[in-house]
């Protein structure tokens, strides 16, 4: 949230890509998720990049934007359509983008980004039906007292519904 209108600046988007490219070679033997704004076709998307063993595996874009109260994500980003998958051509690379599921050595990983987890028809339900083993939820929001406990309870309840387990 700290970038606010700077999300729209091409320089910020370019710097985010440069930082991702700088991180990539340091992920050998690791699976790493990195958040960044992604320009695709005519829109800007709030995305999570999954980097696996030094290589960008793909980008998952947020499907539900927070737009009430102090949240105004629609000012900067577009919501990604559920089920849509595409390819982003960037710097000579073809990068999978969209509503993706990743297979990392037999472990299936999916994402729902922040607000995606707070809606009734959350992407996690569809990802569970697609057989994900691990559901990642990168989140950032304003400060509130005891918010960490609210998030923990929320994740535990969602895990129970999906027959998954949370270890903390």
Q: What is each stretch, according to the model?
A:
Residues 1-168:
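Enzyme catalytic cores with a strong preference for nitrogen-chemistry domains
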């Amino acid at each position: 949230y700290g970038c606010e209108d700077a999300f729209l600046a091409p320089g910020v988007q370019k710097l985010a890509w440069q930082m991702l490219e700088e991180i990539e070679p340091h992920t050998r033997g690791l699976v790493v998720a990195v958040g960044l704004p992604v320009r695709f076709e005519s829109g800007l998307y709030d995305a999570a990049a999954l980097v696996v063993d030094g290589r960008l595996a793909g980008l998952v874009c947020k499907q539900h934007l927070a737009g009430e109260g102090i949240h105004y994500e629609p000012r900067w980003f577009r919501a990604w359509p559920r089920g849509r998958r595409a390819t982003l051509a960037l710097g000579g690379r073809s990068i999978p983008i969209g509503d993706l599921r990743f297979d990392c050595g037999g472990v299936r990983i999916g994402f729902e980004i922040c607000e995606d987890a707070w809606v009734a028809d959350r992407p996690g339900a569809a990802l569970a039906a697609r057989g994900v083993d691990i559901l990642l939820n990168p989140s950032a929001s304003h400060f509130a007292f005891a918010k960490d406990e609210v998030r923990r309870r929320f994740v535990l309840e969602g895990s129970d519904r999906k027959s998954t387990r949370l270890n903390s």
